[in-house]
Amino acid sequence: MVSRQEQFEQVQAVKKSINTASEEVKNQALLAMADHLVAATEEILAANALDMAAAKGKISDVMLDRLYLDADRIEAMARGIREVVALPDPIGEVLETSQLENGLVITKKRVAMGVIGIIYESRPNVTSDAAALTLKSGNAVVLRSGKDAYQTTHAIVTALKKGLETTTIHPNVIQLVEDTSHESSYAMMKAKGYLDLLIPRGGAGLINAVVENAIVPVIETGTGIVHVYVDKDADEDKALSIINNAKTSRPSVCNAMEVLLVHEDKAASILPRLDQMLVAERKEAGLEPIQFRLDSKASQFVSGQAAETQDFDTEFLDYVLAVKVVSSLEEAVAHIESHSTHHSDAIVTENAEAAAYFTDQVDSAAVYVNASTRFTDGGQFGLGCEMGISTQKLHARGPMGLKELTSYKYVVTGDGQIRE
């Protein structure tokens, strides 16, 4: 096993091969990575079977689905890499140019970060997405996956590096930390001078540990306590469609709804319909029904478990939904601001003034009017695959694409000027 220190030194030694690579060279490398990923399907699936067998019974079925790979999912991962090829190269973009009275020309241009570290949990697709985005944005990457997905991740990284071996970019620009202990995560948090940026992707425990302990600059990809508020002026059919999509299309992801707020004028009519759609109809279709966590007002209209205080602060990532009835738009916004992780929140309303108030007052990375929160995604936003959803405000906010993985520098051109 290569030590962490050796890996940090290896990636530092070769980072220039990607930091200054041309768009053509990077695109050729990405295509080679995608081809070798598909070519290694058999090896990746064998590794994934080992991870699945080890994880079964230890994690939820929803989380097992995150871990699971088949040939179609591997092809989708390769397709995601190829889609990055089509994205404009951000490196070298001139952001601003000005000329001073003394003749100096100051150009602000986009440059790579350098080396980006990513700590993430059991999601194999993050490996290929992260490698593609960091490479296209001119960065080397150090990956530290969750223990549950290590065999799969190792097989994926092996395939990606084999692709790079056919190009002029050194394969060591992609590093996988072989040690999956907590100590390896903490070593990355303290790797100042080796990592220019650290991005955690996972649950609240992981993210909080990184934010609280890292001395390397961090972009926080926060958890998603995502709200949908059904206003008194909502179209009920529209609301039900949005709720169904936001909760059931893929409950294990961070842009899935976790809390439903309903105006009291709509509760008596929409909540029984919601119960029929999310419980009765799903049971009839052989699907897992939604388990409600209800406040006292909501429990008057639908059956379910009484909500505990912490249910409104929980990212369930499962077929569980907390429901609260509110008396006004202002109460809904106040609740969101008290419990939100500032990820994605939505209002369903036909009232333009209510929509404007909601979008002005809710301080989240993505705020929706009459649309599902499931759209908070780099691909859906036209950014290609994403590095994560940033819930902070410094440097990056919302889906992080290529530009969010870059910095800038000033190039000052003169003709012998000196400062008097």
Curated annotation (Swiss-Prot):
Catalyzed reaction equations: L-glutamate 5-semialdehyde + phosphate + NADP(+) = L-glutamyl 5-phosphate + NADPH + H(+)
Protein keywords: Amino-acid biosynthesis, Cytoplasm, NADP, Oxidoreductase, Proline biosynthesis
Enzyme Commission number(s): 1.2.1.41
CDD domains hit by this protein: ALDH_F18-19_ProA-GPR
The organism's place on the tree of life at top rank: Bacteria
Example of a GO MF term: glutamate-5-semialdehyde dehydrogenase activity
Gene3D superfamilies: Aldehyde Dehydrogenase, Chain A, domain 1, Aldehyde Dehydrogenase, Chain A, domain 2
Chief location category: cytoplasm
InterPro entries for the chain: Ald_DH/histidinol_DH, Ald_DH_C, Ald_DH_N, Aldehyde_DH_dom, G-glutamylP_reductase_CS, Glu-5-SA_DH, GPR_dom
GO CC annotation: cytoplasm
Coiled-coil ranges (or none): none
GO biological process: L-proline biosynthetic process
Family: Belongs to the gamma-glutamyl phosphate reductase family.
Role of this protein: Catalyzes the NADPH-dependent reduction of L-glutamate 5-phosphate into L-glutamate 5-semialdehyde and phosphate. The product spontaneously undergoes cyclization to form 1-pyrroline-5-carboxylate.
PANTHER family noted in UniProt: DELTA-1-PYRROLINE-5-CARBOXYLATE SYNTHASE (PTHR11063:SF8), GLUTAMATE SEMIALDEHYDE DEHYDROGENASE (PTHR11063)
Name of the protein in its database record: Gamma-glutamyl phosphate reductase
